[in-house]
Amino acid sequence: MTDSSPQSNPNAVPGAADVPAAAQGQQQEQRRGGGGGGRGDRRGDRRGGRRGQDRDSEWQERVVQIRRVSKTVKGGKKMSFRAIVVVGNEKGQVGVGVGKAGDVIGAVRKGVADGKKHLVKVPLTRHSSIPTLSNGRDGAASVLIRPAAPGTGVIAGGSIRTVLELAGIKNVLAKRLGSKTPLNNARAAMVALSSLRTHKETAKERGISLEQIYS
């Protein structure tokens, strides 16, 4: 008696019914060119964009003053806007920038970019104050800042207060001397903050121990 069942051919190409569904999906993705790699790369780009936005969002910007200024040229007077902007992250970094443009938005944008180019690192104590007394001068403006006890707050006014708050200082006393110009006062405050040193740095500069600083 002969066997009538069909014999399998090892050289035969398997049909669609013999291929698993997952393998068929992979083949279709390969035919379309690249599979899911493109989508994965796009997701990575989006995540990178969000990280960049998070870095930008930690910076705060405050406009101190916007003035309309003019420049005399050959054809007459050219009008523009000048913006004074303070930029800080409230974690010990702050900068003051000035921007000029034909419109207010452009002037503020340039002021923010200029402020980020002139950042100053401010040493903060555990009570969000400054380690020592300091003073700064810019033009005819002079600013004196001194540390304060916890709960005092920021005792300052005008552009000086804006600089101190965006630097992350929460307990400080400041006094303005001389000119009342917002730009000069803000820059004088920046000079005072840039000259601050921690107790450890002061002890190292003087060549004494840290215990002698506190004694």
Swiss-Prot record:
Basic and acidic residues biased stretches: 39-61
Keywords for the protein's UniProt record, in alphabetical order: Ribonucleoprotein, Ribosomal protein, RNA-binding, rRNA-binding
Family matches, as Gene3D superfamilies: 3.30.160.20, 3.30.230.10
GO molecular function, one term: structural constituent of ribosome
Biased composition (Low complexity): 12-28
Entry note about domains: The N-terminal domain interacts with the head of the 30S subunit; the C-terminal domain interacts with the body and contacts protein S4. The interaction surface between S4 and S5 is involved in control of translational fidelity.
Family assignment from sequence similarity: Belongs to the universal ribosomal protein uS5 family.
NCBIfam families, per the entry: rpsE_bact
Name assigned to this protein: Small ribosomal subunit protein uS5
Origin species: Synechococcus sp. (strain CC9902)
